[in-house]
Amino acid sequence: MTKRIRQPIIAVLGHVDHGKCLLPDEKVVVPSVGFVTLKELFETASKVVERDDEKEIRELDERITSVNGDGKTGLVKASYVWKVRHKGKVIRVKLKNWHGVTVTPEHPFLTTKGWKRADQLRPGDYVAVPRFIHGNEDEKIFLSYVKVKKSGEEWKEYFYLAGRKGNIDVNLLFVAPKRYVVEFLRGYFEERSEVKGESVIVEARELVEPLSLALLRFGIFSKIQGSKLIVTGKRNLEAFKDYIGFKDEREKALEEAIEKVKGSEVYPIFEEIRRLRLLFGFTREELGSYAKYENSEAPTYEELMEILDFIERGSPSLSKKIAILEGKLKAELRVLEEEGLIKDGKLTPLGRELLEVWRNREFDSKDVDYIRNIAETLVFIPVENVEEEEYDGYVYDLTTETHNFIANGILVHNTTLLDRIRKTNVAAKEAGGITQHIGATEVPIEVVKKIAGPLIKLWKAEIKLPGLLFIDTPGHEAFTSLRARGGSLADLAVLVVDINEGFQPQTIESIEILRKYRTPFVVAANKIDRIKGWVIEEDEPFLMNIKKQDQRAVQELETKLWELIGKFYEFGFQANRFDRVQNFTRELAIVPISAKYGIGIAELLVLIAGLSQRYLEEKLKIEVEGPARGTILEVREEPGLGHTIDVIIYDGTLHKDDTIVVGGKDKAIVTKIRALLKPKPLDEIRDPRFRFDYVDEVTAAAGVKIAAPGLEEALAGSPVIAAPTPEDVEKAKQEILEQIERVVISTDKVGVIVKADTLGSLEALSKELQEKEIPIRKADVGNVSKTDVMEALSVKEEEPKYGVILGFNVKVNEDAEEVAKAKDVKIFVGNVIYKLIEDYEEWVKEEEEKKKRELLSKVTFPGVIRLYPDERYVFRRSNPAIVGIEVIEGRIKPGVTLIKQNGQKVGVIRSIKSRDEFLQEAKKGQAVAIAIEGAIVGRHIHPGETLYVDLSRDDAITLLKHLRDTLEDTDIKALKMIAKVKAKEDPFWRAI
């Protein structure tokens, strides 16, 4: 069989880049809190994850509005809120007739021409604004906020009257369910608005900001003019009529305005219209009157929908165009030349590509759905002005699973190191180009050579690798996945550490993963651009860039590097700057970089390539014709394809029609591949978000989407094995089942419930729990369900500290959340394994302390006292008797009952006094006066007599079983003395 070296699989772990921040007063809508500034949100989060002089990170458990990959808005979890020190420029971006937002220069905004940094925006650029903002719809959360009970009808009346008065806690516009908020809006608009021409105009005054966003809960986009809000445009007026409306003469005026108005917001997406037109086989001429929307006139929402409907039907003369491009027809050459498909009688690259697309009919409704979603969900507003100013203080940011959120009604975004590596495609397009795989990004070695140039000479040998395959998924998934031959899915890793901030929780987590799976790695010491006085040259190699720095900046870099080197030493690693490393098998290489400006990326790529070839060559040799092996990254449903699996193939070649065996929930799934799909190249015609290339085979290493029957139950993280023969199928089934059975747990024992997103992460979490001797009742893949909560509840009844759910990188289903709240079942979710377990252990400790405090408040402690023999210490003989005593063992408190040596009760201690001070407790050795209710000196008690605190059986059991560690030696002695007294009447006490 033919062997060749495949490209290494690289995972990126560690620091999440949070250089892109907003000023403290920028606001977000948080359904459980309201309309709050980022600073206020930070202050509500009490759990500090990390803190130093430069930044503070706090854990957050809130949901906020974000835009997902389909272009739709929804609520996503915000898991952390950051406060970061910033000294330098900030950019104020003000949109026309809308809000503004102030951000750090590198913060990206979504425009009609893709993501643009704040410092690259210019007046006239169109920026994305949501048409929908999501508030709270949960009555319980609302009632928890207002702390007042009213019926639904009473609340509606309250909100309506508040609207008429124009007075409300603005947070209620987002914390209250829509059914109440709409009543406020009705009252507000009834009292203050007019219908003028084709608009509804309301005087909003100080409510202009929150009111404009509250209207977005109903899909009503408004314009801001001073203190006025203006609702205009067909779909906004229609939504206003449907949700709010009028009950007087304005109702008719509103209907007339809707009739008169011609359209809604405009969408200047000229390039997208051209792309779709060509994809569906139309020339500009065939587009007729719609052609003007391609470069000169932006269509309204309604016009855009018409264009999309027209294009979606496809060109009736497509077969003719195919024949022309194939050279079978000579007609209409001029038109296709004008479109750039033919030049000098030959097909252009665009012409060749379109011929393939048209022949295979590789276009359908999915190609226009994304644009439809964008138009339904977002509005593009022109930038009015961009101002730059100096700022010295704190800036804030949020960590969300979608890397974007809505601030001040504007979509803002975060990016990663991998995004910067992808950007090198622009500079090196002619060198082969970076291609997008399913779940991975391939960087051909030609691109590495183009970027690195003379740096390749550092390795004194030709690089033979075909390229590098970067895994797109979160770092942990690259490692915590089952791989039959052992080890991790990644061959090599890049650990990203902020050189200014040092180690963070995810850094430590990543190091533990790398150590556990014995994965070689290099360190990218990011954000050197933030070193004071650092001279920036975009995309420059580090070794060239450092020569431009003054001595002070170089010295600061050296200091920070030594701090990092010291930290790695604590974890058992010898580390050094990459160009000073003598032996790469013994020393960890640190590459100083700026992901933001591309400094040092060249060295990083060359280092990865060189190390992979030098030290991993044998591991990277694969049997080209051998059966494929891979790992499932994700299971998802695709329109027209059904359930599919996204797989990284790390060995062999996978063919269309191969029989494969994959891991399922409780079985091995055997199925036949119906289609192998890879994303199309990132070009102007085909959109990789929704379009795939159908391929006949893929060879390792590669990311691929597999469509096949019966994949509904497939598990992320499980193996995929190609099986050419029935014997291979049985062997693969056995192998996969053994791995699943090793990880998925289902027992009747008392233990925690564990859920994870993949089999591999489930295995990793379970192992950590077992190492800490935390028992597991059930471990499975998937979101937290209602069944999981009920299972945890049954455990809770037996042992409260184990009646919990630990979820790694999973969501909690809505019904599960409701039951968990109602039944008080604790659910821990997170995306850092050790942090998840740490949180659980901390909670157990708190619960045990709480339980101990409760027991301490209820239990009676043992105590033995002796009355002084001298009559002078009898201060009162009765009602109550007051006598001087010494505590000879244990302790006494007011409220305890005293007994004699024969077990007879003599009375209750009402108070304890030492000189002029009343005490709540007296311990061994203390001499005090006590008041005894019910005792008479001379009849029931006598000077010199020994008395004992009366304990119940429950007291004794609680003290010995649950509070043993709180008992002092003297308490134990007192307990034994009391037990001796009580054993005369009750045999139970003889055992103590």
Curated annotation (Swiss-Prot):
MF terms in GO:
endonuclease activity; GTP binding; GTPase activity; translation initiation factor activity
**Name of this protein:** Probable translation initiation factor IF-2
Listed A to Z, the keywords are: Autocatalytic cleavage, Endonuclease, GTP-binding, Hydrolase, Initiation factor, Intron homing, Nuclease, Nucleotide-binding, Protein biosynthesis, Protein splicing
Signal sequence coordinates: none
Under the heading NCBIfam families, the entry gives:
aIF-2, intein_Cterm, intein_Nterm, PRK04004.1, PRK14845.1, small_GTP
**Gene3D superfamilies associated with the record:** Hedgehog/Intein (Hint) domain, Homing endonucleases, P-loop containing nucleotide triphosphate hydrolases, Translation factors, Translation initiation factor IF- 2, domain 3
One GO cellular component assignment for this chain's record is: cytoplasm
Keyword Repeat (UniProt): no
Q: Explain the post-translational modification.
A: This protein undergoes a protein self splicing that involves a post-translational excision of the intervening region (intein) followed by peptide ligation.
SUPFAM superfamilies per the UniProt record, alphabetical? Hedgehog/intein (Hint) domain, Initiation factor IF2/eIF5b, domain 3, P-loop containing nucleoside triphosphate hydrolases, Translation proteins
Identify the residues that the record assigns to the tr-type G domain, covering every copy: 399-616
Asked whether the keyword Hydrolase is assigned, the reply is yes
Gene that encodes it: infB
Which family is annotated?
Belongs to the TRAFAC class translation factor GTPase superfamily. Classic translation factor GTPase family. IF-2 subfamily.
* GO aspect biological process, one term: intein-mediated protein splicing
- Which residue numbers delimit the DOD-type homing endonuclease domain? 96-220
Q: Which SMART domains match?
A: HintC, HintN
Q: Entry's Pfam families?
A: GTP_EFTU, GTP_EFTU_D2, GTP_EFTU_D4, IF-2, Intein_splicing
Other facts: The intein interrupts the GTP-binding site.
Instruction: Name the job this protein performs.
Output: Function in general translation initiation by promoting the binding of the formylmethionine-tRNA to ribosomes. Seems to function along with eIF-2.
